């Protein structure tokens, strides 16, 4: 029986439709995890929640940075690969590279959990939580990257269906269980649902790229191309994980470090929720921008302007809302012990609004093939971030120091990105023609 050919280009949806689907999936998936964290904040003590949040944020940052790095390279290469068989082999190469990176990162985190805990807290009290974080890392990074691969293959509807279905299933299971007393229970449910979502995503990718030549396979040429594009991208995004961990460790080294981490972590969940939206739009925008083979510079500028106005404007609106409603949010949703976290949320709301703009600018530079330029600017951002966090902590700002440092670093990064785009206005056009 002859297999169905991949969907023709005429069935591809517009960027606006893809954005609506992607945002719906992002809101559903992040909202489900967000509610779980609120439930845990009510169930655990502030100290235990601080340890758990430290591990969770470590895993989430490292996992998402790895996934974003690989998916950014895939979103650049796959839309420009016209031959179906070559695209299939190239997609398989990116999946192999992703699995290898996740395995190395998760193993390193698991084996060094005790050492990291001693460096951060002065004791091994967070070692078990970090070992649990290594497992969470596998689930979050793999499903996030597969979702971006689906975007690059134009499967926006299927990707949104999987994300929304997994989120609804997670909420339904937790609702029937009642209050969560042990984080391990929530972890097991989370991993099981992520495994199902990843399996569904792989099935969809298989159907999208099916042909008459048997099972998936890749080769050295595809692996070299994947590594060539993913290396600077992964280095750029992964740089944020250790840098963020250094700043969290400086916060944990304070006299009431675990308490300060808890205050920061509950506010950081709102930062993740806001920045997840421009990150999703970035994963959507990059394939659309990279696909402009033979397009005019005006067309590329117009598509990028639409993405920037939509994603950047939404990030600014959400950041302003979080800044203004920080006090009410913590009064309504969290125990009284977390009331002082509103200050952290305000500083992180400013950082989140700036991050939304920076992410889209970064994707525009990546669409032009300037991956190493992004890496250089990320290195400068990291230095400013650590230096500003150290200074703010020394001045006694406590948990809000991290948000203040991120805001200062993002301001500098946006300035550098804007100057880069002005000097390389036609790079995307030249790059697109080289693939055609």
UniProtKB/Swiss-Prot annotation:
Annotated InterPro entries: Poly_Biosynth_Transport
Transmembrane regions: 20-40, 49-69, 91-111, 132-152, 160-180, 184-204, 234-254, 261-281, 307-327, 341-361, 375-395, 396-416
PANTHER family named among the record's database cross-references: O-ANTIGEN TRANSPORTER-RELATED, PST FAMILY PREDICTED COLANIC ACID TRANSPORTER
This protein's UniProt keywords: Cell inner membrane, Cell membrane, Membrane, Plasmid, Polysaccharide transport, Sugar transport, Transmembrane, Transmembrane helix, Transport, Virulence
Entry's Gene Ontology BP terms: polysaccharide transport
Cell compartment(s), UniProt: Cell inner membrane
Cellular compartments per GO CC: plasma membrane
Protein task: Probably involved in polymerization and/or export of exopolysaccharide EPS I which functions as a virulence factor. May play a role in export of EPS I or its intermediates across the membranes.
Protein topology in the membrane: Multi-pass membrane protein
Entry protein name: EPS I polysaccharide export inner membrane protein EpsE
Organism: Ralstonia nicotianae (strain ATCC BAA-1114 / GMI1000)
Keyword Oxidoreductase appears in the UniProt entry: no
Family: To E.coli bicyclomycin resistance protein (BCR).
């Amino acid at each position: 029986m002859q297999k169905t050919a991949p969907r023709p280009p005429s069935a591809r949806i517009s960027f606006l439709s893809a954005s609506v689907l992607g945002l719906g999936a992002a809101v559903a998936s992040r909202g489900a995890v967000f509610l779980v964290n609120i439930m845990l904040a009510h169930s655990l003590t502030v100290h235990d929640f601080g340890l758990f949040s430290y591990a969770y944020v470590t895993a989430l940052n490292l996992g998402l940075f790895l996934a974003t790095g690989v998916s950014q390279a895939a979103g650049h290469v796959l839309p420009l690969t016209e031959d179906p068989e070559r695209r299939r082999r190239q997609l398989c190469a990116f999946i192999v590279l992703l699995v290898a990176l996740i395995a190395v990162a998760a193993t390193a985190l698991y084996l060094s959990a005790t050492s990291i805990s001693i460096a951060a807290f002065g004791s091994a009290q967070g070692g078990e939580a970090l070992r649990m974080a290594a497992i969470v890392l596998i689930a979050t990074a793999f499903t996030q990257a597969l979702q971006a691969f689906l975007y690059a293959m134009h499967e926006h509807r299927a990707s949104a269906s999987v994300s929304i279905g997994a989120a609804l299933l997670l909420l339904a299971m937790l609702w029937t269980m009642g209050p969560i007393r042990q984080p391990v229970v929530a972890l097991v449910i989370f991993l099981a649902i992520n495994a199902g979502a990843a399996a569904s995503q792989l099935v969809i990718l298989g159907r999208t790229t099916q042909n008459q030549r048997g099972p998936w396979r890749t080769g050295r040429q595809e692996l070299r191309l994947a590594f060539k594009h993913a290396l600077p991208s992964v280095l750029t995004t992964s740089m944020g994980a250790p840098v963020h961990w250094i700043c969290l460790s400086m916060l944990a080294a304070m006299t009431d470090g675990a308490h300060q981490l808890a205050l920061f972590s509950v506010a950081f969940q709102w930062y993740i929720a806001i920045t997840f939206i421009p990150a999703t739009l970035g994963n959507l925008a990059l394939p659309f921008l990279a696909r402009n083979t033979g397009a005019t510079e005006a067309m590329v500028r117009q598509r990028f302007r639409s993405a920037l106005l939509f994603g950047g404007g939404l990030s600014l609106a959400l950041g302003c809302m979080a800044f203004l409603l920080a006090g009410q949010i913590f009064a309504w949703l969290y125990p009284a012990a977390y009331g002082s976290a509103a200050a952290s949320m305000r500083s992180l709301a400013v950082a989140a609004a700036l991050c939304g703009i920076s992410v889209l600018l970064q994707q525009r530079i990546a669409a032009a093939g300037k991956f190493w330029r992004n890496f250089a600017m990320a290195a400068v951002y990291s230095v400013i971030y650590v230096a500003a966090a150290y200074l703010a902590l020394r001045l006694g700002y406590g948990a809000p120091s991290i948000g203040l440092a991120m805001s200062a670093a993002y301001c500098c990064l946006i300035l550098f990105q804007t100057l880069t785009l002005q000097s390389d206005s036609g790079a995307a056009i030249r790059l697109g023609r080289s693939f055609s």
